[in-house]
């Protein structure tokens, strides 16, 4: 793959073969910004997990202490009092069957979809549309709930979802390059603590194989996992 000049220049800032302490890795990531805009800072945890084992197929959500810097559009499927709560929480779209019908016609002007359990039977028919886009509500991520007020507030305050991919990686957003280093550090440590808290008992050997941090379109910087827990 042909790389741009900025990408190649960023490679001179650090050693791709070296593993860096957390604080230094974050500092280097901010220096390697390739994009002209306020780039997203991303993190990937490579875990020693087997997707074939049900208890090792990690999926969940957490609220980052300093958010992600990204404003998400939230759609809520609810009726009555719960619909009012969604509006109170400043959800971008609130509806029931009317919203489901709209989605069925390929409307996806939202980033997260929240639904009450009552709405799931109707919504489940759209699994083929929502599933591939990662938009299907799920109890594990808190997007199927009766407490829509809390759900919307958490999403607006920087809640992220994480899910193990086929290669054993969990890839998430940590924030923006404009965040100061302390905020990015705390966000990453929060994610680390969450992954440690949900570590399956059946894991054998080293749980976290590697951790990498990068900004949009920039090369990844390896982090020493031991320094994250310090």
UniProtKB/Swiss-Prot annotation:
Annotated signal sequence range: none
Record-linked InterPro entries: Ribosom_uL1_bac-type, Ribosomal_uL1, Ribosomal_uL1-like, Ribosomal_uL1/biogenesis, Ribosomal_uL1_3-a/b-sand, Ribosomal_uL1_CS
GO cellular component, one term: large ribosomal subunit
Cystine residue pairs: none
Molecular function, one GO term: rRNA binding
Role summary: Binds directly to 23S rRNA. The L1 stalk is quite mobile in the ribosome, and is involved in E site tRNA release. Protein L1 is also a translational repressor protein, it controls the translation of the L11 operon by binding to its mRNA.
Family named by the database record: Belongs to the universal ribosomal protein uL1 family.
UniProt xrefs under PANTHER family: 54S RIBOSOMAL PROTEIN L1, MITOCHONDRIAL, LARGE RIBOSOMAL SUBUNIT PROTEIN UL1M
Protein name: Large ribosomal subunit protein uL1
